[in-house]
């Protein structure tokens, strides 16, 4: 919407919903943070920081995370959307 400012998303309810979705997917895959990081070719701190809400996950990272979790990115995204305040407002 023109003229409307986007609020900061880090540590917002919607960001928390994304983190919860990704943590749940990692748990369902039976992976530790280190195992997921190894699959991504990243340090364990990369996973820890987004799971602790210290950093955002961009779209490209979301797709890479989905692949590393052997999860369908569309299914994960839908799970995220159905749990967010922003999506519920637009329905």
Model features per residue range: what roles?
Residues 2-28:
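A short, Lys/Arg-rich alpha-helix, primarily the initiator
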Residues 20-39, 64:
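Short basic helix-loop element that most often maps to the first helix and adjoining turn
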Residues 2-4, 67, 75-91:
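Short, charged recognition helix plus adjacent turn
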Residues 40-41, 46:
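Helix-turn-helix
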Residues 54-64:
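Short, basic-rich loop-to-helix N-cap that marks the start of a DNA-contacting helix
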Residues 34, 45, 55, 74:
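Key DNA-contact positions within bacterial/archaeal DNA-binding proteins
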């Amino acid at each position: 919407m023109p003229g409307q400012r986007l609020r900061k998303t880090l540590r917002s309810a919607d960001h928390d919903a994304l983190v919860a979705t990704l943590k749940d997917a990692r748990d369902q895959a039976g992976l530790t943070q280190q195992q997921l990081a190894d699959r991504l070719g990243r340090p364990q701190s990369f996973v820890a920081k987004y799971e602790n809400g210290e950093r955002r996950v961009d779209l490209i990272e979301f797709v890479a995370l989905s692949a590393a979790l052997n999860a369908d990115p569309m299914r994960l995204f839908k799970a995220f959307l159905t749990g967010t305040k922003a999506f519920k407002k637009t329905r």
